[in-house]
């Protein structure tokens, strides 16, 4: 497995693969990899001939009071896990390689309304940072296919919109959320949880499951369900950020009669901000 830090070296490697007619896949990450990240590589491997994973803690997607400086860097362990999954190259550039004119002066990719709801409210500018770095990676790797986890549903929809709006020739795949045995969605930030908080943490998913069960049973008073769910989270010890039943396509508030839904939630538990979702496809005619 090759380890690359310079964009020129990455471009040269991909150009060699292209000359051989090989199909290239990309798994973008920020490192500190867990089994969910490694599962992304395993998921994508059958869909390409060569697989690149990027490891880059992107300062542009962190707010001023967020955990950019303290975000764990575990490059050696990450590379060992990726190599064991058959990844062909790891691209881990320093910040100055990705933002040569400095982060503040960097050109940005603004997404619009889709990025201004849910996580976009409490993390203003976050999805601008995500969209910008992903477009840069797409330009550098020019992958045929890339994969993102469905746990970060809003991020997946943002990337899908960017690819569509900017006519980027890449197939975007969303991989189902990888969970711990007790249902907690795997996340790098789970490492911030204390032992007691870790015991509480699966309550976010259980709350979403309860809401989804009611919706499948025909309850379409979504605002009441949201209020009840937020109260349940608070009772368990969470500090809810949002808990909403949304249209799956544009993440606007769902209304009775909508069929494609996502029940999405974010909540603080100690130092960890946890997010999760459940996607629903309803058939109200039954």
UniProtKB/Swiss-Prot annotation:
ATP binds at residues 30-37, 149-152, 178, 186-189. (R)-pantoate binds at residues 61, 155. GO terms for molecular function: ATP binding; pantoate-beta-alanine ligase activity. Keywords: ATP-binding, Cytoplasm, Ligase, Nucleotide-binding, Pantothenate biosynthesis. One of its GO terms (cellular component) is cytosol. Beta-alanine binds at residue 61. The active site is at 37 (proton donor). Its EC number is 6.3.2.1. One of its GO terms (biological process) is pantothenate biosynthetic process. Gene3D superfamilies: HUPs (3.40.50.620), Pantoate-beta-alanine ligase, C-terminal domain (3.30.1300.10). Pathway: Cofactor biosynthesis; (R)-pantothenate biosynthesis; (R)-pantothenate from (R)-pantoate and beta-alanine: step 1/1. It catalyses: (R)-pantoate + beta-alanine + ATP = (R)-pantothenate + AMP + diphosphate + H(+). SUPFAM superfamilies: Nucleotidylyl transferase (SSF52374). InterPro entries: Pantoate_ligase, Pantoate_ligase_C, Rossmann-like_a/b/a_fold. It comes from the Bacteria. It is found in: Cytoplasm. Its main location: cytoplasm. Catalyzes the condensation of pantoate with beta-alanine in an ATP-dependent reaction via a pantoyl-adenylate intermediate. Homodimer. Belongs to the pantothenate synthetase family. The reaction proceeds by a bi uni uni bi ping pong mechanism. This is Pantothenate synthetase. The lineage of its organism: Bacteria, Pseudomonadati, Pseudomonadota, Gammaproteobacteria, Chromatiales.
